């Protein structure tokens, strides 16, 4: 079943769909590039999606990503279990007195975790993937690629956890210089780069303002200086954006979010096509013991089977919610790259396969924003995103709480800014919930 099948279902015809041409995703996978911009129904022609059948002739075609993920299993398992076995073992017997087998110590590698790494590599179109205990431990490994005296250039409105790590450990203890710039303006990037810049740290879209950076052009500029380009791609999921194909060197996902999908484990992954970088990242993981446990890897493996369905449904709902907010007089601004009037709309469309399911908005009133967050019933008040359920928070007080107030103001993060992760619920229930939360002021 192709990723676009949701939009062939008459039961979901209330949402606008503008299907784009199919784009190859991963190694032999195909997903539809879907940017929906209206609330008028545009039905996909089922004929163009139907297989061409020739009686008596065997036809081989590349399976869609949803088909591959639903059928993926550990081909090394002698019992051919449909669910990957959990190798809950710290050690594995050696081949003989002087030779290891492929697996010998789970701090270095584990069969269950390796299976997850292989399937993430497939959908990332990456040669190498290394999994970690969390997204933050993955970020820590990336920072080990720079040395005292080096410079890191980061996106301005960076995730609060990344800001805290860079500021407290890299700047104060490691002697690293950090430059924070609005990377959505390419001129800022050009002006900030020097021969000391060894790492360019991007988020596109950024968290929480959903700003869009030109990954291709920034990669070109950074590589001219010999810098590594790293992308925190958490907001997009590995299905909607492939930064490695745009010139990035390393792509990070907090697998806690979209990959696992149920907010039931912590996990992180780093993908690259550079063997030297991959060896360094694996060496760091092995030395520090921050490799993903087989139990958490298994949770991610179970979750990733439904990743295409979840990403598609969440994105479909998000487009409807974003349009609702954009036309609501109580909302002063909506940050979402799926809206045509978003400053980064065209750029994002050129380097992704969809706008995703995370957005933020402003009301101009902290009391009203607090009321919305507190009064909604179907939006969990949590700091995470990417799960099956909708989530809502005020970044000033949650995900970006640790950032000093002057810095948050400089970044453009306001107290009334609301971040929303749209889930798979009935979208009309979500809109009614938001409408009810805004209907009667309690302040």
Curated annotation (Swiss-Prot):
It is an enzyme of class 4 (lyase). The modification N6-(pyridoxal phosphate)lysine is found at residue 257. One of its GO terms (cellular component) is chloroplast. One of its GO terms (molecular function) is cysteine-S-conjugate beta-lyase activity. It is found in: Plastid, Chloroplast. One of its GO terms (biological process) is transsulfuration. It comes from the Eukaryota. Belongs to the trans-sulfuration enzymes family. Catalyzes the degradation of mimosine, which is a toxic secondary metabolite found in all Leucaena and Mimosa species. This is Mimosinase, chloroplastic. It comes from Leucaena leucocephala. The lineage of its organism: Eukaryota, Viridiplantae, Streptophyta, Embryophyta, Tracheophyta.
